[in-house]
Design a protein with these regions (language model features):
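A detector of single, family-specific signature residues
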Residues: 1-343
Length: 343
């Protein structure tokens, strides 16, 4: 192996360097902290249920404004359901009476202790997540200073809804300044997911000569097993690639949209199943991601109707080709509407 590598016959593995390696480390640390905070939320919900306090059933997000106010009041010693329900935020859908009925519990000391500890650990995780956000923002600014890519005008955002557990700064603007393109214009890629992809793959994709090399590295391309000139299997190989997992999440999201990628996912899902449709759609998103970073290509979605029209054209061309090979000619039939008799 060493001899082959010495003569340049082996392709090097991809390892991020410099600031990209630091960005990836900060993002992975932040992800671990978010997962840890989620486990502490579950501990709080368990403590509330053991005290028969069902506030998490009437408040959509227990870690929202209303939920946190109530939890902090309980931890500081408040037990009156009326006083606790008065912490309701005006945007909360449940009324004060509903919240008050859900705040009648047994208030056992051991469960209150577990609730207090879980809340303290959750707050500690949030503080560490905020520290990670500062490190990530500073790293992106250093990468921007090293970048020589021309930056045009940032296009309007497709969605202004804030994602849960999003970083505490404008990711779209920061990534656009670094990359020169807006990755969030690709359907399925939100700001947080685009940031994680850049952290895993870097800003320079020249390590992969083509999009086919890139999708093969991700484990999203068919892994053909050939014996005697015959393809025995073309299943994708098993891979623990984090970027591939992110792209699969994007594929599931885009499958619910009225876009060309969404129409492709739904048509393939009905034919070969959801698992293969997710992989195939993830591969398409990976190609768009590669072309955007490597060649600076902007993505404009043609829409689901355009995809369906192109699909019908391909089916018709295939039928015409098969008919011609058999000595027939396809002719469009004028089908008159059926007459409806009235008795």
């Amino acid at each position: 192996m060493q001899r082959l590598h010495e003569f340049g016959l082996l392709r090097a593995s991809f390892l991020p360097k410099g600031e990209i390696a630091a960005l990836r480390a900060y993002l992975r640390q932040r992800e671990r902290l978010v997962e840890l905070a989620a486990s502490h939320i579950q501990h709080m919900q368990k403590a509330l249920m053991q005290m028969n306090v069902q506030v998490h059933h009437v408040v959509s997000d227990i870690m929202g404004v209303t939920g946190l106010r109530i939890l902090r009041a309980i931890v500081t010693g408040e037990r009156d359901p009326g006083v606790l329900a008065a912490n309701r935020d005006r945007r909360c859908r449940a009324d004060v009476e509903t919240i008050q009925r859900a705040l009648t519990g047994n208030w056992r000391a051991e469960h209150l202790f577990a609730l207090e500890q879980a809340l303290a650990l959750y707050d500690a995780c949030q503080e560490k997540v905020a520290d990670c956000d500062k490190k990530i923002e500073a790293t992106l600014k250093r990468i921007e200073a090293q970048s020589a890519k021309p930056v045009g005008e940032l296009p309007p955002a497709r969605s202004t809804k804030r994602q849960p557990n999003a970083v505490d700064f404008d990711v779209r603007t920061a990534l656009h300044a670094v990359l020169g393109v807006d990755l969030t214009q690709i359907h399925g890629l939100g700001p947080s997911l685009a940031l994680k992809l850049v952290g895993e793959c870097g800003t320079d994709l020249s390590a992969w000569p083509s999009a086919k090399h890139f999708t093969s590295w991700l484990g999203l391309a068919p892994h053909n097993k050939i014996s005697g000139g015959k393809v025995l299997s073309s299943r994708t190989r098993r891979s623990g690639n984090r970027a591939a997992s992110l792209l699969r999440l994007a594929a599931v999201t885009v499958g619910r949209t009225d876009t060309a990628l969404g129409a492709f996912y739904r048509r393939l899902s009905a034919r070969v199943g959801k698992a293969k449709a997710v992989t195939a759609t993830a591969r398409k998103i990976a190609v768009l991601f590669y072309n955007a970073l490597r060649h600076g290509m902007d993505y404009a979605d043609p829409g689901a109707s355009y995809y369906e029209e192109r699909y019908q054209q391909r089916v018709l061309a295939n039928l015409q080709r098969r008919a011609k090979s058999l000595g027939y000619v396809l002719q469009q039939a004028d089908i008159a509407p059926a007459a409806v008799g009235v008795s």
